[in-house]
Amino acid sequence: MERSFTLAPSLLSADFSALDRALVYLEAHGAQWVHLDVMDGHFVPNLTFGAPVLRCLRSKTHLPFDVHLMVSRPADLIEDFVQAGADFLTFHIEAEVHAHRLIHAIRGRGVKVGISLVPSTPVAALSEVLPFVDLVLVMTVNPGFSGQQMIAHCLSKVSALVQMRTERGYSYMISVDGGIDCRTLPQALDAGADVIVSGSAFFSGTLRSLLCKDSSGA
């Protein structure tokens, strides 16, 4: 793997009773961002972190927090997560009719903006907002739970986003989230991913072993 990328481990796969120690662990094992999956039990069938959790963790690490809002009403949560210390706020195009309004509201608070799409949503759904976002998060599993296998054909969206970025002069980063392991990481990078979100494979050690082997040239 010669192509560089940003590693953003997901705290969804960490021990929820020891998140502060998980941050230390991330820093010690090459993480560049912290990915925080916020779930409301409505947009996805799970409940996870709220803004108070981010507020408590913010002082525990220098790493940027990449907050992924998997919620039905993202606009209601923006101010809380801005105040809590989010560096990126990513919401789903499927959850927000007034996407331009929300993008500009987030940017106006000095936070970088991401837009995400689930596996069943085509890249074309993002065409009107791509000029205004800093990050596009391509879900390669149906969101809600860690440890799922990648839906491989979703990587074609990454390639399409790379092509659109080049042809239209956009500057967004492309993140891939879902089913990243030793087998699928090279595939995601070959497709053009700039940011890799990994949960289970990172915390289990399998992905870290691959990264260490690659960096050593073994």
From Swiss-Prot:
**Record-listed a divalent metal cation binding positions:** 35, 37, 68, 177
Q: Which positions bind substrate?
A: 10, 68, 144-147, 177-179, 199-200
Q: Does the keyword Thylakoid apply?
A: no
E.C. no: 5.1.3.1
| GO BP, sorted A to Z | pentose catabolic process; pentose-phosphate shunt
Q: Which Pfam families match?
A: Ribul_P_3_epim
Cofactor(s) listed: a divalent metal cation
Catalytic residues identified in the record: 37, 177
Q: Tell me one GO molecular function of this protein.
A: D-ribulose-phosphate 3-epimerase activity
Function statement: Catalyzes the reversible epimerization of D-ribulose 5-phosphate to D-xylulose 5-phosphate.
Q: Can you tell me which family this protein belongs to?
A: Belongs to the ribulose-phosphate 3-epimerase family.
What name has this protein been given in UniProt? Ribulose-phosphate 3-epimerase
